[in-house]
């Protein structure tokens, strides 16, 4: 008898499959399409461990199943090879990532080929290939054209170990998602994608998506939509004088573009004074804030620079003189003495609140330490304390700052604001529990109706004013009431219910010009630039004349240059900044000298569109053909176990943009998402090289178990959505199952097939198994499908004691077909042994006939006082008395039934209910 030898069978079939391009997908085929893939791996190390292979086992099993069902299946593969993981591995090994990445890809590919993954390798992609990232850069330029890619100065998360900024999604519990280092905030000019512009769309689509609830909840919470009002609290300043401006100049002041003014007549202003800023529009004059005078000087008009920063520029003195004569008359000359005032704009403090109905109870304001007014509002008495507090606060992680179990800290700025609702003065504080990156970076303190505000007010002895009446039936012992109710101490709104008051107060704020209805999002725009080498260069040049200019398509890709030293500098700049020959270029717009952007794109940029590139991977004229992408995509099933709010949000955002650009007919990239659990090490911990508990899949294969046993075992461990642990005994058990199946076919093949067997019984077992396995694979309940196959093999072994007959061939052929998605190598070999030349992969999946399934037993649930205490397997047709007797004699039931029961009720074929 030929023994089961995976080391002989598996390489043989892998070679056959490779030679005839068995799994090559056909564009626009006659069969219905089915596009399935997993999250492509980043080849950052020496290879994948057994835990990584769960994803590929799931995908390959479904792909093979769908082919057998008659689908034109697309199962592609690619490599997420740009980014920190690959670069850090290269640094660790002392080689360039341009060398390590191809080496790692070759190893990863070998692993996938050795487990028999039915991948269409003709569609293989690699994100660090210029042919790929050319189109990543092209997509960037399209986003830039639509205002969805922009650069700004802001405080950003900085990883001191990886020496780069991180997106909000890449900071977990105050630590870097890659290296677990504590991150800090650092002021930097960075590139962003405006994902917030699509927040409502991304939120609106979630309910209808066939994605796991936990992922949809995570994305909903991450987007964090809040509806309320934005309220402007004017600073209570004592101005020494006023400065009037046109509406156009007022807008420039608010935007920070205008920071000085030149007046013919001197104002009553000196350095350190405050000026009230007035906007004059015709006969209307109204205040729009204040400004702190930082410098005041008098000098002849001719001495005023024509290109003074923060002021309108002039071509020459003549244009400057003409401008001043327009305002002040022809008596003005270049020798006329003018007053020049430099100032810092002090805008109103804008606060977002979801509870505008509580504004009359706001008794103080709190600014985040990062708020631009935090230091400016401090006066001589408080400056030192405010500066010291801010310097310490910004060193803390957000987790520490928002920990409600810690005592609140803060510092009074010395400044006051005016509550627009009641005109009351409100002290302005700085406190670290308010975060600069969320909302406006300022909150109104309503201590009577917010626990956090109450704790702060209690510590610093700030007033508490109740404006929502506590309901009479509220018996809670909490010192502040944060529910809804009837307004009190709220002026004209007294007696109004909260839900009505919110709408009325917002309308009143809008009428008064001090607020408006506002929807905000917790989600911030996607920080895309990285100060690292190994990434797609950002296709922007900076021109002193034209500013930031996108590189035109005909100059793409902007190639990543070869560098000798790619270790991050740590100074906030990429190593590309030192590549002067590469960085110096010409402006595509004016042809003048310009500098390339030296930051690279986060690896998530390349992984946000690869699912669409798979549909047309060799197209060198565009990112994909519209016919191909609209035939294959959206992805029918996408499998992974990571990136709930990063990649899975970004890929949705980009696809929505592609729809708006007319590049796709759909907005959502994935129809069904399967989010699997982890396979942990035998010790119950996550597999990790540092812990020394990694299981190498090739070691498992080479130990003699083979790839089929590895694949089948990983799917047999338990429900794929839950975590499980590797088991050496478990894989040995799965190998024994496959060996028994193999042996069963060999015994049949060598028998004389002359026995008389119970064909009805054989048919019943076969059709029951077809039904069970088919249903379980559809439901992705692979562990129960494999268990059913194991049980079926056991049943066949019992039946074969009667001997083999010709009818066994059909039963064994069906068994081989059913096991094929899990153990394809062995199935292909057995199919050949059973006399078939056809390719098993494309043989029609077997159908079941309910009429042939004999129900030899039935399950009876036994309840005691309504609680399930046992489940009995009884013969079909057993009498009621017999079933009652079995129920009362069951050990699990006897523990709960003492003496004679009051009633024993039998529901035919389903239930025994015992009442005691």
What does each model-identified segment do?
Residues 201-226, 368-411, 556-586, 812-844:
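Amphipathic alpha-helical
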Residues 59, 72, 371-476:
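Catalytic alpha/beta core of large soluble enzyme barrels
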Residues 3, 12, 16-20, 92-238, ...:
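Residue patterns forming the tRNA-binding/recognition surfaces of aminoacyl-tRNA synthetases
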């Amino acid at each position: 008898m030929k023994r089961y030898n995976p080391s002989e069978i598996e390489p043989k079939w892998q070679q056959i499959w490779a030679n005839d391009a068995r799994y090559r997908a056909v564009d626009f085929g006659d069969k219905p399409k089915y596009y399935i893939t997993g999250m492509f791996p980043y080849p950052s190390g020496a290879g994948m461990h057994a835990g990584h292979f769960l994803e590929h086992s799931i995908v390959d099993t479904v792909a093979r199943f769908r082919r057998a069902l008659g689908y034109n299946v697309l199962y592609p593969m690619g490599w997420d090879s740009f980014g920190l993981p690959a670069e850090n591995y290269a640094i660790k090994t002392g080689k360039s990532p341009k060398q390590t990445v191809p080496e790692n890809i070759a190893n990863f590919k070998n692993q996938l080929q050795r487990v028999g993954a039915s991948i269409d390798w003709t569609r293989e992609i690699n994100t660090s290939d210029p042919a790929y990232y050319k189109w990543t850069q092209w997509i960037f330029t399209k986003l830039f054209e639509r205002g969805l890619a922009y650069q700004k100065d802001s405080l950003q998360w900085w990883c001191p170990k990886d020496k780069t900024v991180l997106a909000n999604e890449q900071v977990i519990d105050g630590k870097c998602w890659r290296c677990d280092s504590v991150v800090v905030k650092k002021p930097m000019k960075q590139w962003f994608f405006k994902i917030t512009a699509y927040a409502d769309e991304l939120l609106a689509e979630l309910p209808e998506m066939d994605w796991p609830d936990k992922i949809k909840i995570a994305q909903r919470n991450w987007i964090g939509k809040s509806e309320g009002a934005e309220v402007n609290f004017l600073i209570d300043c004592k101005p020494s004088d006023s400065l009037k401006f046109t509406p156009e100049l007022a807008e420039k002041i608010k935007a920070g573009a205008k920071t000085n003014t030149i007046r013919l007549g001197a104002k009553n202003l000196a350095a350190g004074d405050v000026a009230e800023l007035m906007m004059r529009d015709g006969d209307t004059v109204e205040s729009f804030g204040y400004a702190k005078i930082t410098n005041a000087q008098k000098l002849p008009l001719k001495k005023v620079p024509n290109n003074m920063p923060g002021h309108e520029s002039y071509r020459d003195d003549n244009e400057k003189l003409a401008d001043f004569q327009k305002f002040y008359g022809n008596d003005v000359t270049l020798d006329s003495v003018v007053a020049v005032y430099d100032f810092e704009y002090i805008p109103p403090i804008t606060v977002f609140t979801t509870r505008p109905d509580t504004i009359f109870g706001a008794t103080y304001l709190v600014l985040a330490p990062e708020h631009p007014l935090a230091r400016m509002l401090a006066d001589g008495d408080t400056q030192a304390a405010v500066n010291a507090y801010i310097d310490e606060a910004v060193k803390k992680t957000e987790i520490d700052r928002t920990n409600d179990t810690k005592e609140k800290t803060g510092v009074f700025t010395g400044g006051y604001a005016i509550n627009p609702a009641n005109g009351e003065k409100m002290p302005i504080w700085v406190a670290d529990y308010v975060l600069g990156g969320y909302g406006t970076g300022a909150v109104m303190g309503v201590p009577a109706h917010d626990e956090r505000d109450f704790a702060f007010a209690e510590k610093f002895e700030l007033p508490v004013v109740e404006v929502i009446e506590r309901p009479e039936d509220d018996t809670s012992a909490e010192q502040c009431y944060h529910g809804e109710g009837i307004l009190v101490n709220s002026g004209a709104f007294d007696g109004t219910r909260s839900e009505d008051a919110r709408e009325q107060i917002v309308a009143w704020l809008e009428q008064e010009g001090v607020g408006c209805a506002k929807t905000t999002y917790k989600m911030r725009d996607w920080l895309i630039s990285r100060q690292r080498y190994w990434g797609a260069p950002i296709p922007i040049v900076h021109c002193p004349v034209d500013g930031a200019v996108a590189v035109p398509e005909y100059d793409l890709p902007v190639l990543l240059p070869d560098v000798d030293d790619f270790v991050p500098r740590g100074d906030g700049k990429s190593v590309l900044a030192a590549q002067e020959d590469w960085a110096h270029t010409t402006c595509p717009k004016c042809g003048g000298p310009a500098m390339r952007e030296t930051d690279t794109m986060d690896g998530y940029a390349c992984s946000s569109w690869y699912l669409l590139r798979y549909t047309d991977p060799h197209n060198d004229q565009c990112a994909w053909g519209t016919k191909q992408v609209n035939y294959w995509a959206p992805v029918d099933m996408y499998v992974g176990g990571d990136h709930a709010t990063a990649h899975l949000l970004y890929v949705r955002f980009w696809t929505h943009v592609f729809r708006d650009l007319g590049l796709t007919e759909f907005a959502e990239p994935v129809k069904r998402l399967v989010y699997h659990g982890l396979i942990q090490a035998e010790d119950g911990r996550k597999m990790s090289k540092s812990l020394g508990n990694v299981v190498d899949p090739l070691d498992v294969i080479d130990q003699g178990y083979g790839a089929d046993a590895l694949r089948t075992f990983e799917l047999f461990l338990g429900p794929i959505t839950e975590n499980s642990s590797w088991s050496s005994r478990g894989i040995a058990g799965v190998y024994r199952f496959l060996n028994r199946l193999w042996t069963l076919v060999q015994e049949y093949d060598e028998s004389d097939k002359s026995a008389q067997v119970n064909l009805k019984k054989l048919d019943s077992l076969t059709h029951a198994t077809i039904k069970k396995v088919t249903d379980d694979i559809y439901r992705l309940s692979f562990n129960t499908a494999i268990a059913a196959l194991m049980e079926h093999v056991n049943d066949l072994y019992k039946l074969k004691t009667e001997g083999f007959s010709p009818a066994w061939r059909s039963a064994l052929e069906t068994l081989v077909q059913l096991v094929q998605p899990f153990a394809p190598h062995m199935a292909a070999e057995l199919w050949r042994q059973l006399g078939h030349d056809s390719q098993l992969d494309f043989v029609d999946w077997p159908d079941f006939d309910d009429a042939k399934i004999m129900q030899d037993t039935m399950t009876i649930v036994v309840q005691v006082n309504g609680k399930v205490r046992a489940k009995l397997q009884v013969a079909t047709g057993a009498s009621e008395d017999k079933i009652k007797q079995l129920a009362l004699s069951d050990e699990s039931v006897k523990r709960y039934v003492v003496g004679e029961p009051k009633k024993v009720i039998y529901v035919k074929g389903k239930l025994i209910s015992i009442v005691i």
